[in-house]
């Protein structure tokens, strides 16, 4: 199992034709800072280079799949507008472009197992998966409008495409929480595996069993990734455009100081998202 550095809560394990990426930061509900999202991107980029791998599975340990961005990390910006623009351009824009591009262009069949809620940027990125499985108590929440941001992580295209415009508008514009059953009915999830809270280890094993049974040696690996490439090809240019537009719209918000003030309120407990 590869460890991707001290800043990382991400690990990679190779199981023949399957690579398993695991997020393990339960004490923070698997919230991720910029360096940890970078580590996740690097893990996926590493897997992409392995010719023997045809399926990438992303799993998480603990109560949440991911609570999104780690709001406990300071997001204070310089007072000077030029310095502020430079800071967010070199951090927010660069890191978001990288992680979104990595998910959008990942060449392996991508499987995600939601052991619990998925929030924010993480929820947007999950939408790029080819197969998504979840527990009944999982929910998706993209509270961008609540924290003064706009859509990110390719959500304005990938999440809308997978969830459908009606539910996607509820998720993105209203910052509405969508439970697993709603996600399944909308076609966002492939299947719900009935495991209660506290059974995340058993759920992870169930997802891996599904992968072995449905995407195993009885299917030609080159065909799997070849079919995915053909399915995704018409959308890629649109996704790349959405990614660029999202990060620069987000940059404008950060330069104005709007989201970091909302993050401060959340971190201090002054504000709670209306779940």
Q: PLM ranges: what are they?
A:
Residues 21, 58, 70, 125-127, ...:
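Hydrophobic/aromatic residues within transmembrane alpha-helices
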Residues 1-4, 261-275:
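Terminal low-complexity tails and localization/encapsulation signals of metabolic enzymes
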Residues 52, 60-99, 118:
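Glycine- (often His-adjacent) and acidic-residue-rich active-site loop
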Residues 131, 170, 174-176, 182, ...:
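Well-ordered beta-strand positions
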Residues 95-147:
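Glycine-rich beta-to-alpha active-site loop
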Residues 133-138, 189-244, 257, 268-274:
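C-terminal long alpha-helix characteristic of the crotonase
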Residues 1-61, 275:
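Conserved CoA-thioester-binding segment of acyl-CoA-metabolizing enzymes
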Residues 156-166:
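Hydrophobic, secondary-structure "cap" segments at the distal end of domains
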């Amino acid at each position: 199992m590869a460890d991707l550095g001290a800043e990382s809560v991400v690990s990679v394990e190779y199981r023949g034709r399957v690579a398993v990426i695991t997020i393990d930061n339960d004490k923070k509900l698997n919230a991720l800072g910029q360096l940890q999202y970078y580590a996740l991107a690097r893990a996926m980029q590493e897997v992409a280079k392995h010719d023997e791998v045809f399926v990438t599975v992303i799993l998480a340990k603990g109560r949440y799949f991911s609570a999104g961005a780690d709001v406990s990390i300071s997001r204070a910006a310089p007072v000077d507008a030029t310095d502020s623009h430079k800071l967010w351009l070199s951090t927010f824009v660069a890191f978001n472009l990288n992680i979104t591009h990595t998910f959008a262009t990942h060449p392996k069949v991508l499987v995600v197992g939601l052991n619990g809620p998925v929030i924010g940027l993480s929820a947007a990125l999950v939408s790029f998966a080819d197969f998504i499985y979840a527990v009944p108590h999982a929910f998706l929440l993209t509270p961008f409008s609540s924290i003064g941001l706009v859509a990110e992580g390719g959500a304005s295209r990938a999440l809308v495409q997978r969830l459908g415009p009606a539910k996607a508008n509820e998720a993105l514009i209203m910052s509405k929480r969508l439970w697993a059953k709603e996600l399944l009915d909308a076609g966002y999830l492939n299947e719900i595996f009935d495991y209660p809270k506290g059974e995340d280890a058993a759920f992870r094993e169930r997802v891996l069993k599904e992968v072995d049974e449905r995407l195993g040696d009885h299917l030609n690996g080159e065909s799997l990734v070849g079919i995915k490439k053909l399915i995704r090809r018409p959308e890629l240019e649109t996704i790349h455009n959405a990614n660029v537009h999202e990060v620069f719209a987000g940059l404008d918000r950060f330069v104005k100081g709007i989201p970091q003030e909302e993050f401060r309120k959340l971190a201090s407990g002054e504000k709670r998202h209306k779940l």
